[in-house]
C-alpha cells in the first residue's frame, strides 16, 4: 500500500488499519478482538507510531501513513517483506525515517526486498543491491563493494561493474 494512493477520507483509525491485516488469523467478516491488541501495539511501536493508534489514518502525513502501512505488514511477524517504492511521495525527513526503519528491520532479521529509485537512500539502507539498468540486469553486489558514486554511474549506464 502506498501512502500517496490511499483515500485519506477512509474512516479508520491507525489501529484498525494495522489490525485489518489480521483477518486471515481471525477469520473473514469476524471482528478483530482485543486478543490481537498486543500484536498491533508491537507493530506500531516498531515503526514509532504507537501514540497515534486512535488517530484517523487520513489525519496523518504521508510519511506517517507509510509507517502505518509498514506496521500493517509487520503485524503478522513476517520473515520476508516486499516493498515497492516505500518512499515515493513523502518529504525528505520522512524518507530518512523510513529508510532508517527499513535498515533497523533488516538488522532485526527480516529480509527486505525493495524497489527504489532513490539511490542515496537505497545505498544507505541496504546491505545487498541488485542493480537493474535500462539494458537489464547489471550486478548483484554488497554495499561495501561500491560507493554511492559508483552505483550512480551504473544506474546512468556509464559503468559496468563485474565481480571476478
What would you call each of these model-derived segments?
Residues 92-94:
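Helix N-cap at the start of a conserved alpha-helix in ABC-type nucleotide-binding domains
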Residues 77:
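Conserved catalytic motifs of ABC-family nucleotide-binding domains
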Residues 56-60:
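Conserved ABC ATPase signature
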Residues 19, 34-52:
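Conserved ABC ATPase "signature" region
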Residues 116-117:
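H-loop/switch region of ABC-family ATPase nucleotide-binding domains
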Residues 129-142:
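H-loop (His-switch) and adjacent beta-strand-loop-beta switch element
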Residues 81-84:
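Catalytic Walker B motif of ABC-type/P-loop ATPase nucleotide-binding domains
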Amino acid at each position: 500500500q502506498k501512502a500517496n494512493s490511499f483515500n485519506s477520507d477512509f474512516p479508520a483509525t491507525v489501529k484498525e488499519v494495522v489490525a485489518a491485516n489480521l483477518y486471515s488469523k481471525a477469520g473473514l467478516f469476524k471482528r478483530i478482538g482485543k486478543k490481537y491488541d498486543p500484536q498491533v501495539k508491537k507493530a506500531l511501536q516498531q515503526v514509532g507510531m504507537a501514540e497515534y493508534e486512535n488517530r484517523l489514518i487520513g489525519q496523518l502525513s504521508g510519511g506517517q501513513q507509510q509507517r502505518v502501512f509498514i506496521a500493517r505488514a509487520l503485524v503478522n511477524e513476517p520473515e520476508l517483506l516486499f516493498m515497492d517504492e516505500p518512499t515515493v511521495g513523502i518529504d525528505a525527513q520522512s524518507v530518512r525515517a523510513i529508510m532508517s526503519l527499513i535498515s533497523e528491520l533488516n538488522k532485526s532479521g527480516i529480509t527486505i526486498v525493495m524497489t527504489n529509485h532513490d539511490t542515496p537512500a537505497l545505498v544507505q539502507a541496504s546491505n545487498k543491491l541488485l542493480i537493474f539498468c535500462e539494458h537489464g540486469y547489471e550486478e548483484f553486489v554488497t554495499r561495501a563493494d561500491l560507493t554511492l558514486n559508483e552505483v550512480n554511474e551504473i544506474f546512468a549506464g556509464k559503468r559496468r561493474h563485474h565481480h571476478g
